[in-house]
């Protein structure tokens, strides 16, 4: 997952790509021929990642590119700009309606199972042999569950493997535990939070923090819970999510972290070992390694900053974090064409597919290897990274996908998670009591969402 484009840049792209066609919308989709005589496919995304993949598909399939071209709209999720614009485009329909559109984990259920699910085409309607291809590619069940609509049809799949691992510093592991072996470290930090905090205590004795901030454990807590925030249109606080209050307070009271907030400067500083105290690890998928920790480690080769001083092991509890699902418009007149693109990105497990190229670092010039949705592809690929001291990360991320749970999400997660984490921080900072924080959280949900709160 790459950093999002800024809102201004994204809106600039939006204007650039859509200004060329000022024709009015019709009520139904129709074939869209450009001045070149090619059929136009409308692509909607919140970063340039998926549009770049489609460009690659066009490059590798010149016969396809002779017939089709893309009109791309990119709007960053910053300040919640993407969803309203996408919703309006889907509802308006017509020749400017999205043919392919993207949704990330924080709001994907709205488009696969929630209010906007009515717009999504089933993958089978795109000419994809869904059941057999999912099985052949060994797609993790959580990804399938999230992309399945209430009728049981798959309408979205991801291309990333976003099952989570514990990503830790080898030098600190050796100093405190006498080993940096992932097979041994996973037994030290887990399974379960009790062992994790035992490890935190040993790290603290030597002046280290186990994580940078409480946000580092949040995604493990959130995605390992049994229930989502909303059940039968009623707010539910799963006991495992409520326990986040206690886990966060334990981190704070025992000085087990640097009390940072994720995606802020102090959090990034801990990745290069320049925080108030050195931090042992972070929780995350492969994208956190490639696109967040590596760029902020203070170096570009072994010996610089913390580059090469990292490893991954199974986390104390299984979870996933993030991911992008590809969907198609059920009213598109170009289902066969968009089905070919989506299949190549999400399910093709041959050496000619996106998944294989991405897993093996041959997709682009950067040579970045990433964990992909297909377990089959990762099994046949080499995930060794110098950044991880030569470790093959796929040995950890393949099973990590199987531990993830995709049945505890709701279409309101992006909003409710923010309310919850804000109140947890107010509790751990002493601004509110535990009860006051929970009550304020419930009030925020009641005031802003059309759900029942007791």
Identify the role of each PLM range:
Residues 356-426, 454:
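Long, aromatic- and glycine/proline-rich binding clefts that accommodate carbohydrate-like moieties
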Residues 124, 131-134, 144-217, 229-262, ...:
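Helix-loop-helix "hinge/cap" segment bordering the ligand-binding cleft or interdomain interface
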């Amino acid at each position: 997952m790459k950093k999002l484009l800024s809102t201004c840049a994204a809106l600039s792209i939006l204007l650039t790509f859509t200004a060329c066609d000022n024709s009015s919308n019709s009520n139904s989709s129709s074939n869209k021929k450009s001045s070149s005589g090619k059929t136009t496919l409308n692509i909607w995304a919140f970063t340039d990642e998926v549009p770049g993949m489609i460009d690659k598909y066009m490059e590798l399939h010149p016969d396809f590119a002779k017939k089709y071209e893309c009109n791309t709209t990119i709007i960053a999720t910053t300040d919640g700009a993407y969803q309203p614009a996408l919703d309006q485009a889907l509802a308006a329909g017509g020749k400017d309606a999205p043919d392919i559109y993207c949704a990330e984990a924080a709001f994907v259920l709205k488009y696969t199972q929630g209010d906007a699910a009515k717009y999504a085409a089933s993958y089978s309607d795109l000419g994809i042999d869904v059941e057999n291809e999912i099985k052949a590619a060994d797609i993790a069940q959580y990804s399938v569950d999230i992309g399945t609509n209430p009728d049981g049809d798959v309408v979205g799949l991801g291309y990333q493997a976003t099952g989570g691992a514990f990503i830790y510093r080898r030098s600190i592991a050796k100093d405190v535990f006498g080993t940096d072996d992932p097979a041994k470290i996973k037994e030290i930090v887990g399974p379960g939070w009790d062992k994790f905090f035992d490890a935190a205590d040993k790290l603290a004795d030597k002046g280290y923090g186990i994580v940078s901030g409480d946000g580092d454990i949040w995604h493990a807590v959130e995605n390992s819970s049994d229930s989502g925030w909303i059940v039968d249109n009623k707010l539910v606080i799963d006991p495992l999510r409520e326990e986040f209050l206690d886990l966060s307070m334990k981190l704070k009271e025992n000085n087990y972290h640097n009390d940072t907030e994720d995606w802020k400067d102090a959090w990034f500083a801990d990745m290069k070992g320049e925080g108030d105290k050195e931090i042992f690890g972070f929780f995350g998928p492969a994208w956190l390694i490639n696109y967040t920790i590596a760029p902020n480690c203070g170096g570009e080769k072994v010996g610089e900053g913390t580059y090469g001083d990292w490893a991954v092991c199974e986390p104390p509890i299984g979870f996933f974090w993030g991911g992008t699902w590809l969907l198609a418009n059920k009213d598109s007149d170009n289902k066969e064409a968009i089905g070919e693109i989506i299949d190549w990105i999400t399910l093709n497990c041959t050496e000619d597919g996106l998944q294989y190229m991405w897993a093996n670092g041959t997709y682009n010039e950067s040579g970045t290897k990433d964990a992909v949705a297909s377990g089959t592809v990762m099994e046949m690929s080499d995930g060794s990274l110098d950044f991880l001291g030569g470790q093959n990360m796929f040995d950890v991320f393949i099973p990590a996908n199987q531990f993830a749970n995709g049945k505890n999400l709701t279409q309101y997660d992006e909003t409710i998670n923010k309310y919850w984490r804000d109140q947890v921080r107010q509790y751990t900072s002493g601004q509110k009591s535990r009860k006051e924080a929970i009550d304020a959280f419930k009030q925020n949900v009641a005031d802003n969402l059309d759900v029942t709160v007791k």
